[in-house]
Every structure is written in structure tokens, then in C-alpha cells.
């Protein structure tokens, strides 16, 4: 069994004034406020959300 890669995602900018789909991507990743961090699986679905709102986030491999 292989272990799945993990990504640490931190919200660095606010979602105030952003379009609804970008707010939904941030919420879908489990982020709630600036400097909030979550660890998510490195899947194509999560990568897609991260790429869409990359200007709001900081991403590190765990």
C-alpha cells in the first residue's frame, strides 16, 4: 500500500470581494480565515481548487 502525499495549505489573503466560485474553492479546502492552515490530500480535485485560488494561498508539501 502506498501512502498518499499531503499538502499543507494556508490562506494568506482574504476572500472578501472575490467571486463566488473562488470563495467556494477556499471553503472546499476547509479554510476559514487568514493564516488558517489545513492538511489535504494531494489529489487532482484538491490541486484544481488550489490552482484556481493560488493567489490567495501558500502551499507546502508535508
Curated annotation (Swiss-Prot):
InterPro entries: Ribo_uL30_ferredoxin-like_sf, Ribosomal_uL30_bac-type, Ribosomal_uL30_ferredoxin-like. GO terms for biological process: translation. Keywords: Ribonucleoprotein, Ribosomal protein. GO terms for cellular component: cytosolic large ribosomal subunit. Transmembrane segments: none annotated. It holds the Pfam family Ribosomal_L30. One of its GO terms (molecular function) is structural constituent of ribosome. The keyword Lipid metabolism does not apply. Part of the 50S ribosomal subunit. HAMAP family: Ribosomal_uL30_B. Belongs to the universal ribosomal protein uL30 family. This is Large ribosomal subunit protein uL30. It comes from Alkalilimnicola ehrlichii (strain ATCC BAA-1101 / DSM 17681 / MLHE-1). The lineage of its organism: Bacteria, Pseudomonadati, Pseudomonadota, Gammaproteobacteria, Chromatiales.
Amino acid at each position: 500500500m502506498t501512502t498518499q502525499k499531503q499538502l499543507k495549505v494556508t490562506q494568506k489573503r482574504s476572500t472578501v470581494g472575490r467571486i463566488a466560485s473562488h470563495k467556494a474553492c477556499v471553503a472546499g479546502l476547509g479554510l476559514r480565515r487568514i493564516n488558517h492552515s489545513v492538511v489535504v490530500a494531494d489529489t487532482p480535485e484538491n490541486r484544481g481548487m488550489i490552482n484556481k485560488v493560488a493567489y490567495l494561498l501558500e502551499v507546502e508539501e508535508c
